[in-house]
């Protein structure tokens, strides 16, 4: 399985925004789940119904996004030979954390619950942003980041654990280039609703496989998600032909008025269309 992602956190005019660009080598089936925990916390999250990958937010304005570090070893979502997808252990960790009643408890849960979430995790509450970096070979490094100084971007190579993740060759180059390019696009974007569409249009001179949104035979961007933690809004973007949205599972109590909102949007063009048929 190949799992390459970009996660982003930035302040947009006082609104903390988390975003994720999700690349896969299979066609995911995604759904949105609405629920209220036994403690009265409303949660809304996107889940891959085959692997249990989960990202989302709660009514306290706490959101979580994640990208992998052990791209091919720990995250074996899909085997082309067996045509099967192994469940992600991080899905239950994210849902457990989103059900917590405080930001501190949410961060603690992500760091320790069932051994702690793996990879790069960005978790924010609209005011504070915490970056967690963890693998099955290391201990988690937890740092508070000041988004008022600069945005945060993470891809698939280690920062606090530089020996982890992509380490050599085109994989390392891809991860580093995507991080630099994503940071540049993020800096240049003034409206949070334009962030991921700007990722979608991104091009650079090293060829399509290094674009932020890609359409390759072995790897392609299947979906994107952006969360405005202040406005408590989630937007899920679908890439044509690369993902299937299977609907909404609404577990909210009858008569409950949701505090969280979401939209599902589908791009009208494929990523390769930006090259006008002249891909290299």
Model-predicted regions and their roles:
Residues 1-4, 9-101, 105, 117-119, ...:
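C-terminal, well-structured catalytic/ligand-binding subdomain of enzymes
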Residues 111-114:
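Short regulatory alpha-helical segment in sensory/regulatory domains of signaling proteins that mediates
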């Amino acid at each position: 399985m190949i799992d390459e992602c970009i996660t982003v956190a930035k302040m947009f005019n006082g609104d903390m925004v988390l975003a994720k660009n999700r690349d896969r080598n299979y066609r995911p089936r995604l759904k949105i789940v609405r629920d209220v925990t036994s403690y009265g916390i409303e949660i809304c999250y996107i889940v891959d119904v085959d692997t249990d990958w989960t990202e989302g937010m709660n009514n306290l304005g706490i959101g979580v996004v994640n990208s992998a570090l052990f791209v091919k070893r720990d995250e074996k979502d899909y085997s082309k030979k067996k045509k099967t997808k192994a469940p992600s252990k991080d899905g239950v960790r994210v849902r457990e954390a989103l059900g917590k009643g405080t930001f501190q408890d949410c961060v603690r849960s992500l760091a320790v619950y069932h051994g702690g979430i793996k990879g790069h995790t960005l978790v924010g509450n609209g005011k504070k942003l915490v970056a967690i970096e963890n693998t099955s070979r290391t201990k988690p490094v937890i740092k508070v980041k000041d988004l008022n100084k600069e945005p945060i971007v993470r891809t698939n190579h280690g920062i606090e654990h530089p020996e982890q993740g992509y380490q050599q060759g085109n994989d390392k180059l891809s991860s580093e280039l995507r991080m630099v390019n994503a940071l540049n696009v993020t800096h240049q974007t003034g409206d949070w609703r334009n962030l991921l569409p700007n990722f979608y249009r991104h091009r650079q001179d090293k060829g399509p496989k290094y674009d932020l949104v890609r359409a390759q035979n072995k790897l392609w961007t299947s979906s994107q998600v952006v969360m405005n933690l202040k406005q408590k809004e989630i937007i899920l973007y679908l890439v044509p032909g690369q993902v299937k949205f299977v609907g909404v599972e609404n577990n909210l109590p009858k008569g409950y008025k949701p505090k969280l909102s979401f939209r599902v949007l589908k791009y009208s063009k494929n990523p390769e269309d930006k090259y006008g048929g002249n891909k290299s």
